[in-house]
From Swiss-Prot:
Organism listed in the record: Rhizobium meliloti (strain 1021)
Residues binding Mg(2+), per UniProt: D713, D717
Catalytic activity: Cu(2+)(in) + ATP + H2O = Cu(2+)(out) + ADP + phosphate + H(+)
Binding site for Cu cation 1: C26, C29
Enzyme type, top EC level: translocase
Membrane-topology annotation of the record: Multi-pass membrane protein
Function: Involved in copper transport.
Name of the protein in question: Copper-transporting ATPase 1
Claim: Signal is one of the keywords in the record: no
Record-annotated membrane-spanning stretches: 172-192, 209-229, 246-266, 270-290, 429-449, 457-477, 772-792, 795-815
HMA domain boundaries: 15-80, 82-147
Active site: D514 (4-aspartylphosphate intermediate)
PANTHER family linked: ATP7, ISOFORM B, P-TYPE CU(+) TRANSPORTER
């Protein structure tokens, strides 16, 4: 083997792809990972290094990055993956989206890529060893410009760029119109106004008239219209035509034919030396006008994000010594003490140190009533202080603030693809090539079978087919509705963390609710304590509260609060043990103490039947009975009640009005749960459920093919939120519940659930309207442009009318999507 052959062969072998891996601790881990990766189809070899925590993988063909990542995860380790957002400029239709996604996925180390036409962004998931420059190069090689998007919530730069694009298009439209108008008047006036034709013949002459038309049309085509050529021609040469390519083919055909008719008319058959300069120019002008209107409409679709970005102030007054100094918000760090005066926006999240005021949190929660803030209260960046003044300590800054997280959630939802878009992706993959084929067949059919002059008919109809086809409308149909719908939801305090929830929420048949903190305020109150014979109420409460002081459960807080309000002193407890769903046990003053539900006592030989009548009475009144045992003897029955939220009855009624069944899942005993269900009109009750049994409860509700949306707020709700078809977290709940959810209600108000469902239905309905329009437009008008009506009634579609129709089709889709901004679900 020669050196040249060796070099040639080595060059043909693709470079290995590196994967970062976390969690390996020994050589056994290395072998396990190597074995898992080697089992992935297409992997030639895998070498794992424990010290560097990296795997070098050699593929036989195209890298299956996603397969390797999945294999690492299944082996029990965590691959190091980066998710980076890129801005992509120059996309005009769904074919562009498909092309960019395909280009990105061919980059070694890229696991997945999702591109959104409406936001002009691509989200790329790749392994840590991938050079970002390679990803950017792939986009540029596909024929588009790329830039790395900045951190979420940091800047409004994409909007500035969109405004610049809108202004540029406006200038191009004006320039193109100025050049096209005289051309249009001269050509059309000659046809419809005999006086104009005579004036041109006498003062300009036919030959000079053609030269003027040529000059004006050429200026339009290669001036304002040059943007179509810059994108369309390279894509044609790559055999990946897009909408720009259709415009280039159509206008160039009309212009080129006219040039031949002007300067070499002898090459054309007799009677066919007609010019179509005005058609080429008007097509460019109308399509530019459509792009301009489209750009303006796109800007309005992202108004929600712009408003969220505008909530954040630019500066903050931070304590430096004995004075407060104004600094840039980017310079604020955790721990800074910040002063807020009346009317000012709160710059970052924090905890109030001193002062008292009311804060307008409507832009975050959707609730119009200002919330009182005093020492110890949490404040959120972006909210507006009303009439008081206070200082607070910054706890979250930059991308960690709630506002930044909300913006990120909205952007993520806006950039997602719904299942309904799968058909669109399949169609748009072959749409443009199919249109070009139809145009070629149209030209051939008219040239062979058409009336005289056949060449003229063939050219005009083929150009009309190329121009009228509009893949843009199909590509924009879904993402624009998602953008506006999720943005409107954010304004109402409803965050769709996953775009798919927009579609799945409307399909829900059952709304399952956790009780505590969801139906109720989550702040239980001690209402009753009935001691057994030989015990005093305050004595029992002292033992019980001393034990419960070590628990973080809301019921424990209620018991401790009641003891303190009665002036009962607490003593240290030992041997504390909590069993979720049962209760707590420990020792107080050397005596064993146990507090919990009736099921907690059956296994320890303590009979709670003496309180059966009392338990029934308390349960029927909607209170939760608990039992207390001291030194192995039943000491008392205790009742706590968690007040129902004021808006819960209204929310349940609204869900019923939507035709939904409402179910409650609770750990309360059956009697208490049934009492609350009767009070609220809840259809189905799953009671006495242990925390880890909520998943099974959701599964039971799903029997028979029913779709279930589960609403919860606590840590123990997270598995059920994940199991449900749609998980809805109450925004006042725990972080883990919110992370597990598909939808977040920022206000913690259940009335947001019917609002979210109504928005889901409105958005999907809007998407279907857009898709129907986009498909119906192309399916019906492409044949008309080809001339199928000519044999019936002599109707042909002018390329100029085709351009106008195409330009307006995308504008119609965007305009329809913008209607979602005015949706106001009750």
């Amino acid at each position: 083997m020669t050196a040249f052959t060796q070099i040639e062969k080595s060059a043909a072998v693709p470079a290995p792809t590196d994967f970062g891996i976390e969690g390996m601790t020994c050589a056994s881990c290395v072998r396990r990972v190597e074995k898992a990766i080697s089992a992935v189809p297409g992997v030639a070899s895998a070498t794992v290094n424990l010290a560097t925590e990296r795997a070098s993988v050699q593929f036989t063909g195209a890298p299956d990055t996603g397969g390797v990542l999945l294999a690492i995860e299944k082996a029990g380790y965590e691959p190091k993956v980066i998710i980076q957002e890129f801005g992509i400029e120059g996309m005009t239709c769904a074919s562009c989206v498909s092309r960019v996604e395909k280009a990105l996925r061919t980059v070694p180390g890229v696991a997945d890529a999702s591109v959104n036409l409406a936001t002009e962004k691509g989200t790329v998931r790749f392994v840590s060893g991938v050079d970002v420059a390679a990803i950017e190069a792939a986009v540029r090689d596909a024929g588009y410009d790329v830039r790395k998007a900045k951190a979420s919530g940091a800047t409004a730069e994409p909007e500035d760029r969109r405004e610049l694009e809108t202004r540029t298009l406006k200038r191009l439209v004006i320039l193109s119109a100025v050049l096209t108008l005289p051309l249009f008047l001269v050509e059309m006036g000659s046809h419809f106004m005999p006086g104009v034709h005579e004036w041109i013949m006498e003062n300009i002459g036919m030959r000079h008239n053609l030269y003027i038309q040529f000059a004006l049309a050429t200026a339009v085509l290669f001036g304002p219209g040059l943007r179509f050529f810059r994108k369309g021609v390279p894509n044609l040469l790559r055999w990946t035509p897009d909408m720009n390519s259709l415009v280039v083919l159509g206008t160039t055909a009309a212009w080129g034919y006219s040039v031949v008719a002007t300067f070499a008319s002898g090459l054309l058959p007799s009677g066919t030396a007609n010019v179509y300069y005005e058609a080429a120019a008007v097509i460019v002008t109308l399509i530019l006008l459509g792009r301009y209107l489209e750009a303006r409409a796109k800007g309005r679709t992202s108004q929600a994000i712009k408003r969220l970005l505008g909530l954040q102030p630019k500066t903050a007054f931070v304590a430096h010594g004995d004075e407060f100094v104004e600094i840039q918000i980017s310079d604020v760090v955790v721990g800074d003490v910040i002063r807020i005066r009346p009317g000012e926006k709160i710059p970052v999240d924090g905890t109030v140190l001193d002062g008292n005021s009311y804060v307008d949190e409507s832009m975050i929660t959707g609730e119009p009533v200002p919330v009182q803030k005093a020492a110890g209260a949490e404040v959120v960046g972006g909210t507006i202080n009303k009439n008081g003044s206070f200082t607070f300590r910054a706890t979250k800054v930059g991308g960690d603030t709630l506002l930044a997280q909300i913006i990120k959630m909205v952007e993520t939802a806006q950039g997602s693809k719904l299942p309904i878009q799968a058909l669109v992706d399949k169609v748009t993959a072959w749409f443009v090539p199919a249109v070009i084929l139809v145009a070629v067949l149209t030209f051939a059919a008219w040239y062979v079978f058409g009336p005289s002059p056949a060449l003229t008919f063939a050219l005009v109809n083929a150009v009309a087919v190329l121009i009228i086809a509009c893949p843009c409308a199909m590509g924009l149909a879904t993402p624009t509705s998602i953008m506006v719908g999720t943005g409107r939801a954010a304004e109402l305090g409803i965050l769709f963390r996953k775009g798919e929830a927009l579609q799945s929420l409307r399909e829900a048949d059952v709304i399952a609710l956790d009780k505590t903190g969801t139906l109720t305020k989550g702040r239980p109150e001690l209402t009753d304590i009935v001691p057994a014979d030989g015990f005093e109420a305050d004595e029992v409460l002292s033992f019980v509260a001393s034990l419960e002081a070590l628990s973080e459960h809301p019921i424990a807080e209620a018991i401790v609060s009641a003891a303190k309000s009665r002036g009962i002193a607490l003593v240290p407890a030992t041997d504390f043990e909590a069993t979720p769903g049962f209760g707590v046990r420990g020792a107080v003053s050397g005596l064993p103490v146990q507090v919990g539900a009736d099921r907690a006592f059956s296994g320890v030989g303590i009979d709670v039947s003496p309180f059966v009548v009392e338990a029934e009475r308390l349960g029927n009144s909607g209170k939760s009975p608990l039992y207390a045992a001291i030194d192995g003897r039943l000491a008392a029955i205790i009742a706590v009640s968690d007040p129902i939220k004021d808006t819960t009855p209204q929310a349940i009624k609204a869900l019923h009005d939507l035709g939904l069944k409402v179910a409650m899942i609770t750990g309360d005993n059956r009697r208490t749960a049934d009492a609350i269900a009767r009070q609220l009109g809840i259809d189905e009750v799953v009671a006495e459920v242990l925390p880890d049994g909520k998943v099974d409860a959701v599964k039971r509700l799903r029997e028979g093919g029913r779709k279930v949306a589960f609403i919860g707020d606590g840590i123990n709700d997270a598995p059920a939120l994940t199991e449900a078809d749609v998980g809805i977290a109450v925004g006042t709940g725990t972080d883990i519940a919110i992370e597990s959810a598909d939808v977040v209600l920022m206000s913690g108000d259940l009335i947001g659930v019917p609002k979210a469902i109504a928005l889901s239905k409105a958005t999907i309905r809007n998407i279907k309207q857009n898709l129907f329009w986009a498909f119906a437009y192309n399916v019906s008008l492409v044949p008309v442009a080809a001339g199928v009506l000519y044999p019936l009634n002599g109707t042909l579609l002018s390329p100029i009318l085709a351009a106008a129709a195409m330009a307006m089709s995308s504008v119609f889709v965007l305009g329809n999507a913008l209607r979602l901004r005015s949706v106001n679900p009750a």
